[in-house]
Amino acid sequence: MKVVLLQDVKGLGKKDSIVEVNDGYARNYLIPRKLAAPLTEGLEKHIKEKKEAEQKKKEKELMLAKDLADKLEKSQVIIKAKAGENGKLFGSITNKEIADEIKRQLGIDMDKKKIELEDPIKQIGSYEVSIRLYQGIVAKLKVHVTSS
């Protein structure tokens, strides 16, 4: 019997996948527990449409991420911070401050978790910061730290 999984089932498949199972397993276990539904033409068509819509959404997100990456690659962010005479900052600049400055200077809402800093910035100078925008898309943003 072919069924559509309504939830992830360990050892069988993920949600919305169509699987072939024994009739008894489907009728006595999967269907009563709302883990699966019998496959009908309407349900199969609905799942196909849902997968196509999901694919289009992923493609759109990918295009937006590529556009954003191009914009960030061409941009730079200038951060002013208090520093001592030798160029050492009082405190440090973390990915949260960089995200705030991207929002303020470029008007782009950026999640601080997407900004990759090995260590917080503690010196005046120019840095290249990696920003993970999407799976496989990483933008390099130039960050200039100056003393205020």
Curated annotation (Swiss-Prot):
<dbReference type="GO" id="GO:0019843">
    <property type="term" value="F:rRNA binding"/>
</dbReference>
<dbReference type="InterPro" id="IPR036935">
    <property type="entry name" value="Ribosomal_bL9_N_sf"/>
</dbReference>
<comment type="similarity">
    <text>Belongs to the bacterial ribosomal protein bL9 family.</text>
</comment>
<dbReference type="GO" id="GO:0005840">
    <property type="term" value="C:ribosome"/>
</dbReference>
<keyword id="KW-0687">Ribonucleoprotein</keyword>
<dbReference type="GO" id="GO:1990904">
    <property type="term" value="C:ribonucleoprotein complex"/>
</dbReference>
<dbReference type="InterPro" id="IPR009027">
    <property type="entry name" value="Ribosomal_bL9/RNase_H1_N"/>
</dbReference>
<comment type="function">
    <text>Binds to the 23S rRNA.</text>
</comment>
<dbReference type="Pfam" id="PF01281">
    <property type="entry name" value="Ribosomal_L9_N"/>
</dbReference>
<keyword id="KW-0699">rRNA-binding</keyword>
<dbReference type="InterPro" id="IPR000244">
    <property type="entry name" value="Ribosomal_bL9"/>
</dbReference>
<dbReference type="InterPro" id="IPR020070">
    <property type="entry name" value="Ribosomal_bL9_N"/>
</dbReference>
<dbReference type="Pfam" id="PF03948">
    <property type="entry name" value="Ribosomal_L9_C"/>
</dbReference>
<dbReference type="GO" id="GO:0003735">
    <property type="term" value="F:structural constituent of ribosome"/>
</dbReference>
<keyword id="KW-0689">Ribosomal protein</keyword>
<dbReference type="InterPro" id="IPR020594">
    <property type="entry name" value="Ribosomal_bL9_bac/chp"/>
</dbReference>
<dbReference type="InterPro" id="IPR020069">
    <property type="entry name" value="Ribosomal_bL9_C"/>
</dbReference>
<dbReference type="InterPro" id="IPR036791">
    <property type="entry name" value="Ribosomal_bL9_C_sf"/>
</dbReference>
<dbReference type="GO" id="GO:0006412">
    <property type="term" value="P:translation"/>
</dbReference>
<keyword id="KW-0694">RNA-binding</keyword>
<protein>
    <recommendedName>
        <fullName>Large ribosomal subunit protein bL9</fullName>
    </recommendedName>
</protein>
